[in-house]
Amino acid sequence: MSFSERLLAAWYRGHPALALLRPLEALYRRVVNARRADFLSGRKPAYRAPVPVVVVGNITVGGTGKTPMILWMVEHCRARGLRVGVISRGYGARPPHAPWRVRPEQDAAQAGDEPLMIVRRSGVPLMIDPDRPRALRALLAEEPLDLVLCDDGLQHYRLARDLELVLIDAARGLGNGRCLPAGPLREPRERLESVDALLYNGADEDPEDGFAFRLRPAALVNLQSGERRALGYFPAGQMLHAVAGIGNPQRFFGTLEALHWRPIPHAFPDHATYSATELTFDPPLPLLMTEKDAVKCRAFAAADWWYLAVDAVPSPAFVAWFDARLEHLLAR
């Protein structure tokens, strides 16, 4: 287990040594609170776009199902007749310049794994740049849009936003409730009182303070051929190698077990890069990975490599709430 994996486990399961990091946590809290106060007070300017901006973000370190939820929002907005675009930091991307328009034919090293996955799945106009306001200006210069979704960026206060949605893993919650580096929180938990909605990934029903959503396995897709198969293609009891380089790989492995398969888990760091050698395991079995990992492996995939396509399914209450908020934002 790597240091980052051990630290993540300590944040969510508890460890007495974390008390040694509380002085650094106090400093971190002061810095992030002061930075947010500067933008809220107007001492530092924030870019206000001519179209509504919806931030879909995290308050915790680690995966919460943000990318599938953005894909759901893209399709939902399109079904309402809206022209929607996405901006992203492009974590791990190395484009020739920034801002950079992500295209389906690009590779993950250039575009970033999550932006490339979003574009290949949906075809949505998407611009990456660590400077979110610059990404948004560039996207609007190329596309006539009604609405922009900001992938992550909850803490990027240089970009004014009209709606803030925060995703939380229902099983892990906020961990020990402490800020970095003593805990997994990017901002103090009080920050959640000011966001517009909390969405709990994996909750069985809507909690009192937010909405539930789940990730529904949809299909098996072959990396080499693009062939799409129903989940029943792998029978119950099928042994397979399971690869996950995401924020919470155990959620992926648990999903495979819930489908009555027998995964041999291979967890990698979030946003990991791969080679064919790294993904050659014994015994020889089908290999199943996340869609986010698949965009980095298609060029060297073997014939029995697959990814599990998943769809976000929000609760009916959230869909109704989101539609009402969209109607309000677009009427202004």
Swiss-Prot record:
Superkingdom of the organism of origin: Bacteria
Residues noted as binding ATP in the record, renumbered to the chain: 60-67
Catalysis: reaction(s): a lipid A disaccharide + ATP = a lipid IVA + ADP + H(+)
Keywords of the record: ATP-binding, Kinase, Lipid A biosynthesis, Lipid biosynthesis, Lipid metabolism, Nucleotide-binding, Transferase
GO biological process: lipid A biosynthetic process; lipopolysaccharide core region biosynthetic process
Keyword ATP-binding: yes
GO molecular function, one term: ATP binding
Enzyme Commission identifier(s): 2.7.1.130
Disulfide links within the chain: none
Pathway stated in the Swiss-Prot or TrEMBL entry: Glycolipid biosynthesis; lipid IV(A) biosynthesis; lipid IV(A) from (3R)-3-hydroxytetradecanoyl-[acyl-carrier-protein] and UDP-N-acetyl-alpha-D-glucosamine: step 6/6
Any one cellular-component term (Gene Ontology): plasma membrane
InterPro entries recorded: LpxK, P-loop_NTPase
Annotated HAMAP family: LpxK
Its biological purpose: Transfers the gamma-phosphate of ATP to the 4'-position of a tetraacyldisaccharide 1-phosphate intermediate (termed DS-1-P) to form tetraacyldisaccharide 1,4'-bis-phosphate (lipid IVA).
Family affiliation: Belongs to the LpxK family.
Name by which UniProt lists this protein: Tetraacyldisaccharide 4'-kinase
Organism: Pseudomonas paraeruginosa (strain DSM 24068 / PA7) (Pseudomonas aeruginosa (strain PA7))
Lineage: Bacteria, Pseudomonadati, Pseudomonadota, Gammaproteobacteria, Pseudomonadales
Gene designation: lpxK
